[in-house]
């Protein structure tokens, strides 16, 4: 097949990130300069985002570019490529500041792993083939394994890396076995071919009446298990709290946002190829997981004193919310549902960048004495009375994560409630409301600690370093994020209109 100019433009994000990886590798040979490589990483991701928009403008009113039935680059994929690049930029900024204060040897390779994970995320959002899907997930998983173990002086990090490798390997095995079972019956790994073959069967009962067709059900079930691990929904969540707590903040943020966005995007594509006769099967599986994720995540976060563990369980809860939207998407594939999922993911992304950014800022003032992040909630006692602006930004990000009105997070959660009610998912919608109410307990616990006047001077925090947060790149980033959260919380129509241009 000849690759034409339009297709070359469509592939530019991957090409740009690939060139950036090669450039940094060659640069490391001659000299190690963390600042230079961090800047190169950010520039590469910005160019990749711009190139995605160029493709969208070039192929206006077109369905997208297909390559050998392997990938499909359309407006939908452009949005999620931009989101993944934004996560990568934010992680690069947080990672740079963290590496400045942590004595980690060979810090330049941190950005290589981050870029490789970003390529994996891009492959997931543009995939139109099960092999590309598996390749994208593995690129993310392998890169994350390296990023988790980056603090090589910490035995805990090495232990967590081994745990993640084992559990990730198990989930990938389930995913690969599911792909094999589907291929055994359909004879194809292309989404388009699989959709056509599965559509030839009238219903699931007819399918199950043929012994060989049970391979499809087994394959789909195993693939959902593999995806469930990557999405960190119950009961595939056991790894998440330890990993979030023990890894660098930049890596935890990438896990909470980048990988979740990429997996959600590929699930949207994959679920849309399955015929309607699979609705009942998928509805049961996703509903049970959604209910358990929402309740378990909210309840388990309440007794935690570790902010990172709270955010881990919050991530589980939000995975449950996303499953409700995916169920609605299966029941009624329309633009408003895809728009709702996208709005929620964007609001979730900004809230997480704000929260994790503040944790990273405080950690740089804490790890001067202790080689750990500022994870314990008591380290934030009375922070408002020393750094009021930093605390206000922290409160804005947390309130957005909780879905409080006048924040962008409320708009995202409102969209999910709307599609839940519109598709008559009454029980799941009620569970979502209950879970949101429960989650307020641990979100408010963080906020009240900030305003506790009994602990104004925390001896574990170097306030001379902390007061310089505004002149750091991560300080500028969280200020911008807080402004965006408030602006889109008051005037969401701008971002909603923008996202409408990207729906499938």
Swiss-Prot record:
InterPro entries: NADH-Q_OxRdtase_suN/2, ND/Mrp_TM. It is a multi-pass membrane protein. It comes from the Bacteria. It catalyses: a quinone + NADH + 5 H(+)(in) = a quinol + NAD(+) + 4 H(+)(out). The keyword Zinc does not apply. Its main location: membrane. The chain crosses the membrane at residues 9-29, 38-58, 78-98, 114-134, 135-155, 164-184, 216-236, 254-274, 282-302, 309-329, 341-361, 392-412, 425-447, 476-496. GO terms for biological process: ATP synthesis coupled electron transport. Its EC number is 7.1.1.-. GO terms for cellular component: plasma membrane. It is found in: Cell inner membrane. One of its GO terms (molecular function) is quinone binding. The keyword Transmembrane applies. Pfam families: Proton_antipo_M. Keywords: Cell inner membrane, Cell membrane, Membrane, NAD, Quinone, Translocase, Transmembrane, Transmembrane helix, Transport, Ubiquinone. It is an enzyme of class 7 (translocase). Belongs to the complex I subunit 2 family. HAMAP family: NDH1_NuoN_1. This is NADH-quinone oxidoreductase subunit N. It comes from Blochmanniella floridana.
């Amino acid at each position: 097949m000849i690759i034409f100019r339009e297709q070359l433009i469509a592939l530019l994000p991957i090409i740009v990130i690939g060139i950036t990886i090669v450039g940094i590798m060659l640069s490391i040979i001659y000299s190690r300069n963390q600042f230079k490589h961090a800047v190169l990483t950010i520039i590469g991701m910005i160019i990749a985002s711009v190139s995605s928009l160029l493709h969208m403008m070039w192929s206006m009113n077109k369905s997208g570019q297909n390559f050998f039935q392997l990938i499909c680059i359309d407006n939908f994929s452009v949005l999620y490529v931009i989101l993944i690049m934004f996560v990568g930029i934010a992680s690069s900024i947080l990672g740079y500041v963290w590496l400045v204060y942590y004595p980690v040897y060979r810090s330049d390779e941190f950005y290589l792993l981050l870029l490789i994970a970003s390529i994996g995320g891009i492959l997931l959002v543009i995939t139109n083939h099960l092999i590309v899907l598996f390749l994208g997930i593995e690129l993310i998983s392998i890169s994350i394994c390296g990023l988790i173990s980056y603090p090589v002086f910490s035995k805990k990090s090495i232990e967590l890396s081994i745990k993640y490798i084992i559990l990730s390997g198990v989930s990938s095995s389930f995913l690969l076995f599911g792909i094999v079972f589907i291929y055994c019956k359909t004879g194809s790994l292309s989404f388009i071919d699989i959709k056509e073959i599965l559509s030839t069967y009238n219903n699931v009962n007819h399918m199950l009446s043929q012994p060989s067709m049970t391979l499809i059900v087994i394959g789909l079930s195993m693939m959902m298990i593999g995806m469930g691990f990557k999405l960190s929904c119950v009961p595939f969540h056991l790894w998440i709290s330890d990993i979030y707590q023990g890894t660098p903040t930049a890596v935890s943020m990438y896990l909470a946002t980048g990988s979740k966005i990429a997996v959600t995007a590929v699930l949207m594509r994959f679920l849309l190829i399955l015929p309607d006769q699979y609705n009942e099967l998928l509805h049961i599986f996703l509903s049970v997981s959604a209910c358990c994720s929402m309740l378990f995540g909210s309840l388990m976060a309440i007794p935690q004193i570790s902010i990172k563990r709270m955010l881990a369980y919050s991530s589980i809860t939000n995975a449950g919310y996303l499953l409700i939207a995916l169920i609605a998407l299966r029941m009624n594939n329309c633009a408003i549902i895809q728009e709702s999922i996208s709005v929620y993911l964007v609001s979730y992304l900004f809230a997480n960048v704000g929260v994790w950014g503040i944790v990273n800022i405080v950690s740089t003032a804490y790890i001067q004495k202790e080689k750990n992040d500022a994870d314990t909630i008591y380290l934030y006692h009375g922070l408002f009375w020393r750094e009021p602006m930093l605390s206000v930004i922290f409160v804005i990000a947390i309130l957005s994560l909780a879905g409080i009105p006048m924040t962008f997070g409320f708009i995202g959660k409102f969209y999910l409630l709307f599609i839940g009610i519109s598709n008559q998912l009454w029980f799941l919608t009620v569970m979502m409301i209950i879970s949101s109410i429960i989650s307020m307990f641990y979100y408010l616990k963080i906020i009240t600690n900030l305003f506790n006047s009994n602990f104004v001077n925390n001896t574990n925090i170097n306030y001379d370093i902390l007061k310089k947060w505004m002149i750091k790149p991560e300080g500028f980033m969280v200020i911008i994020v807080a402004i965006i959260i408030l602006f889109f919380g008051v005037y969401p129509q701008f971002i909603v209109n923008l996202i409408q241009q990207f729906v499938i």
